[in-house]
UniProtKB/Swiss-Prot annotation:
It comes from Arabidopsis thaliana (Mouse-ear cress). The lineage of its organism: Eukaryota, Viridiplantae, Streptophyta, Embryophyta, Tracheophyta. One of its GO terms (biological process) is defense response to oomycetes. The gene is LECRKS7. This is Probable L-type lectin-domain containing receptor kinase S.7. It catalyses: L-seryl-[protein] + ATP = O-phospho-L-seryl-[protein] + ADP + H(+); L-threonyl-[protein] + ATP = O-phospho-L-threonyl-[protein] + ADP + H(+). Residues 327-681 are cytoplasmic.
Length: 681
């Protein structure tokens, strides 16, 4: 539909609406979401909160006394107040949680968890009795409404006992409390799953909290009688948009706090009447006219309303048309300008191919010519009859102007890169609404196909010298990207399927679709976490900050793959138990048997000292603490025997940042495919 036709439709719709005698109603949106189990999507994790097997943990899971606090928040703010109708929303939520003490000593219990509503989505509260809700140094900074599930008696906050629920408003001194053990025989820290329902009805100014042990077989029934019922007007506190979530804490205890599922909804926004011919006031039940009005005949009323509609609509519609025309014209001009600028950048040193030439060379982009799939499109084998050469052509999946501009921007990175261990860009084409990039052809394909094809055929295509050469070549490419380019290039997607092998089995790093440019010695910016599970550094998953250290982690996983002939995440043939490659090699290292990790297909034909060095470099690069990982320049020096490697601890260290994720937690989400993108705050 053309723009002019769209504007006409808008125009006549507007006229029809204005000519009707009834006023128009507009309603505010109510919110509704449900998590039957959790993923990292749509949630923000602060402090020690973490995700394991679809369950949110709020505090560290340690068998020794520890101090911890964590918060998980629904990413999107929720509207609780509608200024047009001056209405505060009602809300209902229910969730299942478990509180369990890992130590049988009852003195090591505490402190509990809370469901909260707050304007703040980035402050981590203090541990202990503060329940991760507020900072002990600034207790009045964070305003909130919360239902606490307290498992420790804290006289500082006037707690009645060590097993109670309470309503907290801007303070941890509860307005009202109830002991579920006395009224419902529910022990909050029993280790059993408990389901809670929290209902606030704004029209009744009433908040009810229900509690029941979760039924493991059938749907848990909501109790008829609330455990806590408070007559309170929350409208002064539920103003504007707020965030909802959970927090939990410990202080010198071994208590864990798990959230298993969660649903939340708002309701009760009243409809708002738009302005009509007559002034009126909106109440809960009726409309009262300020002055008596003589109602004209139906025909006169219709003509009168139509005249008003035309008088109002015509000037507005003209302005709207001019605005829309100007907006799209400016947008088109900016995209064309940006594309021309990027096109000029790419022209330097590169050949511009015609679309017809590439179409013919790939047999019309026939599926039989597909040799790979990258972050932004399919890769085709192209045979140029006139020159007798073979190239690889990448075809972008993004057909929009924005998509092509973004793709050109990404490729401007690799267009200026020159290194023997990088796949070289030969040329490009931008015709018929498509963006095509031409790379040198790698006859031996990708590393993963060679590495894992062997296990099926029994033939070993990669001997020890090839594998060592691949590790050194990849380190050389990354050292160039991280330290020798004018701007530092962080690849963000290093994996065996993105490492190509030339005719002599030399490693060539390709697919820069996720790469980012940064200034040297500048702090990186958090972005969408992107890449492939099993290769992602733990701090990258947690904070979304990609650096040369996250690339180093991926490199460590890759060279362990090369040395061991095993995938990053694999299953034992007999038990079908998931095995993490880094953890497996580290366990063998701790037992003094690290060489037992070597690919059996090599049949012992390798340099033991150098192989051990390669395995230990892999572990050092995959160290959970990013500060302990060597730079790629140092890795290259170690593998070239120019310097000695630094020692690798016998036991795999725990993560040093505040989130309590283990590497198993990080990779356990990879059930449906290779590449996963998460939104991380």
């Amino acid at each position: 539909m053309s723009l002019s036709r769209k504007l006409l439709v808008i125009f006549f719709t507007w006229i029809t609406a204005l000519s009707m005698s009834k006023p128009i109603f507009v309603s505010s949106d109510n919110m509704n979401f449900t998590f039957k189990s959790f993923t990292i999507r749509n949630l923000t994790f602060l402090g020690d909160s973490h995700l394991r097997n679809g369950v949110v943990g709020l505090t560290r899971e340690l068998g020794v006394p520890d101090t911890s606090s964590g918060t998980v928040i629904y990413n999107n703010p929720i509207r609780f107040y509608d200024p047009d109708s001056n209405t505060t929303a009602s809300f209902s939520t229910h969730f299942s949680f478990t509180v369990q003490n890992l130590n049988p000593d009852p003195t090591s219990a505490g402190d509990g968890l809370a469901f909260f509503l707050s304007h703040d989505n980035d402050t981590l509260g203090s541990p202990g009795g503060y329940l991760g809700l507020v900072n002990s140094s600034q207790p009045m900074k964070n305003r909130f409404v919360a239902i606490e599930f307290d498992t420790k008696l804290d006289p500082h906050f006037n707690d009645p006992n060590g097993n109670h629920i309470g309503l907290d408003v801007d303070s941890l001194n509860s307005i009202s409390t109830s002991d579920p053990l006395l009224s419902s025989q529910i022990d909050l820290k029993s280790g059993k799953s408990i389901t809670s329902w929290i209902d606030y009805k704004n029209d009744l100014r009433l908040l009810n909290v229900f509690l029941s042990y979760t039924d493991p077989v059938t749907t848990t029934k909501k109790p008829e009688k609330p455990l806590l019922s408070v007559n309170i007007d929350l409208s002064p506190f539920l103003n504007g948009e707020m965030y909802v979530g959970f927090s939990g804490s410990t202080e010198g205890s071994t208590e864990i706090h798990l959230i298993e599922n969660w649903s939340f909804k708002t309701s009760g926004f009243l409809p708002v009447r738009s302005k009509s011919n007559h002034l009126h006031n909106v109440s809960d039940s009726s409309v009262v006219n300020d002055d008596p009005v003589v109602i004209p005949s139906k025909k006169r009323r219709h003509r009168h309303n139509l005249a008003i509609g035309l008088g109002i609509s015509c000037p507005v519609l003209i302005c709207l048309a001019l605005f829309v025309f100007g907006y799209f014209t400016l947008k088109k001009w900016k995209s064309v300008k940006a594309e021309k600028e990027l096109k000029t950048e790419l022209i330097t040193g590169l050949r511009e191919f015609s679309y017809k030439e590439l179409y013919t060379a790939t047999k019309g982009f026939h599926s039989s010519r597909v040799i790979g799939r990258g972050a932004f499109g399919n890769v085709y084998r192209a045979m140029f009859v006139s020159s007798g050469t073979i190239s690889a052509v990448k075809r972008s999946r993004h057909n929009s102007t924005e998509g092509k501009t973004e793709f050109l921007a990404e490729l401007s990175i690799i267009a200026c890169l020159r290194h023997k261990n990088l796949v070289q860009l030969q040329g490009w084409c931008n015709e018929k609404g498509e963006l095509l990039l031409v790379y040198e052809f790698m006859p031996n394909g990708s590393l993963d196909k060679i590495l894992y094809q062997e296990s099926q055929t029994g033939a070993v295509a990669l001997d020890w010298s090839h594998r060592l050469n691949i590790a050194i070549g990849l380190a050389s490419a990354l050292s160039y990207l991280h330290h020798e380019c004018e701007q530092q290039v962080v690849h963000r997607d290093i994996k065996t399927s993105n490492i190509m092998l030339d005719i002599n089995f030399n490693a060539r790093l390709g697919d820069f679709g996720l790469a980012r440019l940064t200034e040297h010695d500048k702090s990186p910016v958090s972005t969408l976490t992107a890449g492939t599970m099993g290769y992602l550094a733990p701090e990258y998953l947690q904070y979304g900050t990609a650096t040369e250290k996250t690339d180093a982690f991926s490199y460590g996983v890759v060279i362990l793959e090369v040395a061991c002939g095993r995938r990053p995440i694999d299953k034992e043939p007999e038990s079908q138990k998931t095995v993490n490659l880094v953890d497996w090699v580290w366990r063998l290292h701790s037992e003094g048997r690290v060489l037992e990790a070597v690919d059996e297909r090599l049949k012992g034909e390798f340099d033991e000292e150098m192989m051990k060095k390669l395995l230990l470099v892999g572990l050092k690069c995959a160290h959970p603490d990013s500060n302990e990982r060597p730079s790629m320049r140092r890795v290259l020096q170690i593998l070239n025997n120019e310097i000695e490697p630094s020692p690798v601890p016998k036991m795999k260290p725990t993560l040093s940042f505040s989130c309590g994720l283990s590497l198993d937690d990080i990779v356990s989400e990879d059930e449906e495919g290779d590449s996963i993108v998460y939104v991380v705050s």
